[in-house]
């Protein structure tokens, strides 16, 4: 009897000790995570309005870090990272326009497609317009839903380089402030095709340095010194990755994607594969294509979320998938300016 009691006390003592160790470990883990959150706040300049908001955001941050680490422990072709969106729930990220801003087209007026008769078998196996000097450095749209302007400008910067030999960083802010009489509404969203229409009517765009980006809507400033122009624009036939390849082989192309998935939110590197939505909400630019070391074919894309997102601001998404709409819908509404 005495031995049984002693054994019971020993077991209870072990359980209490284990519980204490686990509790201490949880406190230690929480303290480490809190310190990580503080470092993240400093890195991205995040300031919360009060302690309650900070506590809530910390819980979101902690959950997102757990998701990222769990995903990266799996068998995937790409990986995730803790970036500037780490204190947003996916619902917040998905429904906010502050980091995206593409408005899907309800009706697309048919245009020509100058690359229709290009022999796809004669195209290069890989294309990267960065190596041809046709891509400006990564930009950051910040808290303004004007991805449409960044996408249109990047595509225009590319064709201007290819047609004139000059790579010029052009003004997104001119579009944000001045292209407001149609579908495009500055930080509230817009369409790349409408941006191209405005640029044609406006006689071009001025430079980034002459009309710098402000990440906010403002009054249109009178600028008469447009430094680059386009003659028109064309839509790539929808839901046709082969047609998109023909276009991208010849110039950077604006594309729209569904950028709301958590894997897109926290994308860090590799070739994005797997399931993805097609509710288009974000405009980016296809600047090439290629094949990864494991044989996976991919599109090379330029985003406008700064260099801390993705592969220094760029993204690779699987190419030629079974869904004709393309990965995250990127083949649904591609277009490009003409010079």
From Swiss-Prot:
Residues annotated as the enzyme's active site: 147, 282, 303
Q: Which GO terms describe its biological process?
A: leaf senescence; programmed cell death involved in cell development; proteolysis; response to abscisic acid; response to ethylene; response to gibberellin
The subcellular location is: Vacuole
Tell me one Pfam family matched here: Inhibitor_I29
**Top-level enzyme category:** hydrolase
Against PANTHER family, the record matches this protein to: CYSTEINE PROTEASE FAMILY C1-RELATED
Protein name according to UniProt: Senescence-specific cysteine protease SAG39
- Source species, please? Oryza sativa subsp. indica
């Amino acid at each position: 009897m005495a031995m049984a009691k002693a054994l019971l006390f020993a077991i209870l003592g072990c359980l209490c000790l284990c519980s204490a160790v686990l509790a201490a470990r949880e406190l230690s883990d929480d303290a480490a995570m809190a310190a990580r959150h503080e470092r993240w706040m400093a890195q991205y300049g995040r300031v919360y309005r009060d302690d309650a908001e900070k506590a809530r955001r910390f819980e979101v941050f902690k959950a997102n870090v757990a998701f990222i680490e769990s995903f990266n422990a799996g068998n995937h072709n790409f990986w995730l990272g803790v970036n500037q969106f780490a204190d947003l729930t996916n619902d917040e990220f998905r429904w906010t326009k502050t980091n995206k801003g593409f408005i899907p087209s309800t009706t697309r007026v048919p245009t020509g497609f100058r690359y229709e008769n290009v022999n796809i078998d004669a195209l290069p196996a890989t294309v990267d317009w960065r190596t041809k000097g046709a891509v400006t450095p990564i930009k950051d749209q910040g808290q303004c839903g004007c991805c449409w302007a960044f996408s249109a400008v990047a595509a225009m910067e590319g064709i201007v380089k290819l047609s004139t030999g000059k790579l010029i960083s052009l003004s997104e802010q001119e579009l944000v402030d001045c292209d407001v009489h149609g579908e495009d509404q500055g930080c509230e969203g817009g369409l790349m095709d409408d941006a191209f229409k405005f640029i044609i009517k406006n006689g071009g765009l001025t430079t980034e340095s002459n009309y710098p980006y402000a990440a906010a809507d403002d009054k249109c400033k009178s600028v008469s010194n447009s430094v680059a122009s386009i003659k028109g624009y064309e839509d790539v036939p929808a839901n046709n990755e082969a047609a998109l390849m023909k276009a991208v082989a010849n110039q950077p192309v604006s594309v729209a994607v569904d950028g709301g998935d958590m894997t897109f939110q926290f994308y860090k590197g590799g070739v994005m594969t797997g399931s993805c939505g097609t509710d288009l909400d974000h405009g980016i630019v296809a600047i090439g294509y290629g094949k990864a070391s494991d044989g996976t074919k991919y599109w090379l894309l330029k985003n406008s979320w700064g260099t801390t997102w993705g592969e220094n601001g760029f993204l690779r998404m699987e190419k030629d998938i079974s869904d004709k709409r393309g990965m995250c819908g990127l083949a649904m509404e591609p277009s490009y300016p003409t010079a």
